[in-house]
């Protein structure tokens, strides 16, 4: 199982990957320089990836301003918590603001709403 990262860092990593994917797709268009239509398609897809990355960065920036900032009990640095449970950005200490989850084993499923029957 992969180690869990903080949600903000996960989304930022996705946005960074979109930028690199966009550049790689645009460079892929160079291989088709004899066909202007294919070059146009590859360049457009690359630019759309970069625009998508910009949108994701703007969205996580807005989300980050609304996140609750807490001091990590382990490393004593300030970190942001999204949802009921999250990890410290610096030391990967599990954090929660829900008193009913204190002392329980960290599980990402605590952030999902359960359906009551």
Curated annotation (Swiss-Prot):
Q: Which UniProt keywords apply?
A: Cell membrane, Membrane, Transmembrane, Transmembrane helix
Any Gene Ontology CC annotation: plasma membrane
Subcellular location(s) of the protein: Cell membrane
Q: What is this entry's stated membrane topology?
A: Multi-pass membrane protein
* Highest taxon in the source lineage: Bacteria
A Pfam family hit = DUF2614
Primary localization class, coarse:
membrane
Q: Could you list the residue ranges that cross the membrane?
A: 13-33, 37-57
* Alphabetical list of NCBIfam families matching this protein: PRK02935.1 (NF002796)
- Which protein family is named in the record? Belongs to the UPF0295 family.
Protein name as annotated: UPF0295 protein Bsph_0336
**What is the originating organism of this protein?**
Lysinibacillus sphaericus (strain C3-41)
């Amino acid at each position: 199982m992969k180690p869990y990262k903080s949600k903000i860092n996960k989304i930022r990593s996705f946005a960074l990957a979109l930028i690199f994917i966009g550049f790689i797709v645009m460079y892929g268009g160079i291989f088709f320089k004899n066909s202007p239509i294919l070059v146009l398609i590859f360049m457009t897809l690359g630019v759309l990836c970069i625009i998508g990355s910009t949108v994701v960065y703007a969205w996580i920036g807005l989300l980050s301003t609304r996140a609750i900032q807490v001091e990590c009990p382990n490393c004593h640095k300030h970190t942001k918590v999204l949802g009921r449970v999250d990890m410290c950005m610096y030391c990967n200490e599990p954090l929660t603001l829900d008193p009913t989850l204190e002392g329980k084993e960290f599980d990402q499923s605590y952030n999902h709403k359960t359906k009551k029957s």
